[in-house]
Amino acid sequence: MKKINLYEENDFNELHMKRFLVHDSPYFKILNFNFKAGQELPVHSHDMEGQVSIMVFEGKGEFLSKDSTMPARKGDVLISEISEPHGVRAKTDMRVLVTIAPPI
C-alpha cells in the first residue's frame, strides 16, 4: 500500500504540461497531468484494446475528441476506449488524473 499527495508531488511548468507517474502495474497505470491555462494534451489514440479515464480534480478546460470538445471542470470524468481519439485543453490552471487499463 502506498499514499501519494499529488499537490506535493507534482507542480506546474510554464512552458508545457507537467506529467507525473503515480502508479504503474501489469493491471493499470495512473498518471497526473498538470496544465497551465492554454496548455493541452493533443488529441491522440493508441492502437490497442483498453480504456482510459480522465478525471478533473482542479480547474476548467475541455475534453477533446477527433471532431468535438466537451466542457471539463472539477469533478468531471471522461471514460473512453483507448483507441478512440482523446485529449485535454486547459482554460485555467488544471490538474487531471488519468487511469489506463491495461497499462500501455
Where are these regions (language model features)?
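Histidine-centered metal-chelating micro-motifs
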Residues: 40-42, 78, 82-87
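A short, N-terminal "cap"/entry segment at the start of jelly-roll beta-barrel domains
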Residues: 1-31
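Conserved short histidine dyad/triad with adjacent acidic residue
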Residues: 31-47
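A short, compositionally biased micro-patch
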Residues: 25, 36, 56, 81-83, ...
